[in-house]
């Protein structure tokens, strides 16, 4: 029987509130310091996992006590999850780490129907939760008092240290090859019954991003996993699941030329995926993450309507923010293009700042518009992508078997940023 832990987070004294501090997510202001304390230990004789399957946390937000319910995201990793790096002489070194007792959770706030949460419990609590339309961050302060955490509104995360005009300036996904939007679909009730689909996602970290994080492989791995944990929450309303098939780090050197011209880099990366990656790692889609500053305001680029394609099921992402939520939305945007989604037209869609907005808002939404829903349904109907309709092979255990990829076709609609 799964044991539930009840933890209370008590507010610290007032002197700890209101000052500025630098966290992993950036400089923050107007935060509250809280202290997680376990109230209900496991019964005598019970075996405690390092990270329980379900947990509850109680704490105060703006003076109101709330209860955060968390459930371990057991579908986060594929059965063949792998991590790859390179030796000094260029040899691939691939390991298959145990991921059974991982530390990533989704959740909700008790008594708030529309609340959501994505939390990492790897080293204290880190993540975000949404309640009554407000997004809050929680993160360990990593002070001498190891139990201290900061709770703050998303808007209080300073953007002054973010590059590429992320502070006060929205970023856009530049469209290199504009594609005419397909006609809006009038979905019947039957069409609105979304099929369960899933994708095995492979993430590649290039050498510039590896250097940006001070060659700290463990930190990079946790950072990437946090982003995918959030992405799984984003895609849930589409009945679309994401499993992480693996992370590869180009820790010694890049295996392609990562150019500032995003179009060139995307083409090179897609070709590398086809000729190298697919021969050794089973994946339906791959996304390159890089610290290279793409030309203009572009922070991502992907092929449209190419999910499952052996050559073009790919995208590239600029590591433009230290905020996990903002990066998860960026990757979700490019993955949306792979799934047939076009940019939202604010005059026709029901959302001004949804996932597929042409410009990335620094206070991002985690919602897909009705236009994106229709585009995705049309993609499923027209393209019939086989790889995402297969039974999801999710697990949290070690496995060393790797099989080939199942391509769909070579028809490509074009680039989309």
UniProtKB/Swiss-Prot annotation:
Its EC number is 3.4.24.-. Residues 407-417 have a biased composition (Acidic residues). Residues 398-417 are annotated as: Disordered. It holds the Pfam family Pep_M12B_propep. Expressed by the venom gland. InterPro entries: MetalloPept_cat_dom_sf (IPR024079), Peptidase_M12B (IPR001590), Peptidase_M12B_N (IPR002870), Reprolysin_adamalysin (IPR034027). Residues 197-392 form the Peptidase M12B domain. GO terms for molecular function: calcium ion binding; metalloendopeptidase activity; toxin activity; zinc ion binding. It is found in: Secreted. GO terms for cellular component: extracellular region; plasma membrane. Belongs to the venom metalloproteinase (M12B) family. P-I subfamily. This protein is an alkaline zinc metalloprotease from snake venom that possesses weak hemorrhagic activity. This is Snake venom metalloproteinase acutolysin-C. It comes from Deinagkistrodon acutus (Hundred-pace snake).
């Amino acid at each position: 029987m799964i044991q539930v832990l009840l933890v209370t987070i008590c507010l610290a004294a007032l002197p700890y509130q209101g000052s500025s501090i630098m966290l992993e997510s950036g400089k923050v202001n107007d935060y509250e310091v809280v202290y997680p304390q376990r109230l209900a230990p496991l019964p005598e004789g019970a075996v405690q996992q390092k990270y329980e399957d379900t947990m509850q946390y109680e704490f105060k937000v703006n003076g109101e006590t709330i209860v955060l319910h968390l459930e371990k995201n057991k579908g986060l990793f594929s059965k063949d999850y792998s991590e790859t790096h390179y030796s000094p002489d260029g040899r691939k070194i691939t390991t298959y780490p145990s991921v059974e007792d991982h530390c990533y959770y989704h959740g909700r706030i008790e008594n708030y129907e529309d609340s959501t949460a994505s939390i990492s419990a790897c080293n204290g609590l880190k993540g975000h939760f949404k309640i009554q339309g407000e997004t809050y961050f929680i993160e360990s302060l990593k002070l001498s008092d190891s139990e201290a955490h900061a709770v703050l509104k998303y808007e209080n995360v300073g953007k002054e240290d973010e590059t590429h005009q992320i502070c006060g300036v929205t970023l856009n996904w530049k469209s290199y090859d504009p594609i005419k939007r397909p006609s809006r679909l009038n979905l019947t009730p039957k069409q609105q019954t979304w099929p369960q689909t899933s994708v095995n996602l492979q993430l590649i970290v290039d050498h510039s991003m590896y250097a940006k994080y001070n060659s700290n492989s463990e930190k990079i791995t946790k950072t990437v996993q946090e982003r995918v944990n959030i992405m799984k929450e984003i895609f849930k309303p589409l009945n679309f699941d994401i499993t992480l098939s693996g992370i590869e780090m180009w820790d010694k050197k890049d295996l392609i030329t990562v150019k500032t011209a995003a179009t060139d880099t995307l083409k090179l990366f897609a070709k590398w995926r086809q000729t190298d990656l697919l021969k050794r790692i089973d994946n339906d889609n791959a996304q390159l993450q890089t610290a290279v500053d793409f030309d203009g305001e572009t922070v991502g680029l992907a092929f449209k309507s190419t999910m499952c394609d052996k050559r073009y099921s790919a995208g590239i992402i600029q590591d433009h923010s230290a905020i996990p939520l903002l990066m998860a939305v960026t990757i979700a945007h490019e993955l949306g293009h792979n799934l047939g989604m076009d940019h939202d037209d604010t005059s026709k869609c029901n959302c001004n700042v949804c996932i597929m907005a042409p410009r990335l808002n620094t206070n991002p939404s985690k919602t897909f518009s009705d236009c994106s829903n229709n585009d995705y349904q049309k993609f499923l109907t027209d393209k019939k992508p086989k790889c995402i309709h297969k039974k999801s092979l999710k697990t949290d255990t070690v496995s060393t078997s790797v099989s080939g990829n199942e391509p769909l076709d070579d028809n490509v609609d074009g680039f989309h940023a």
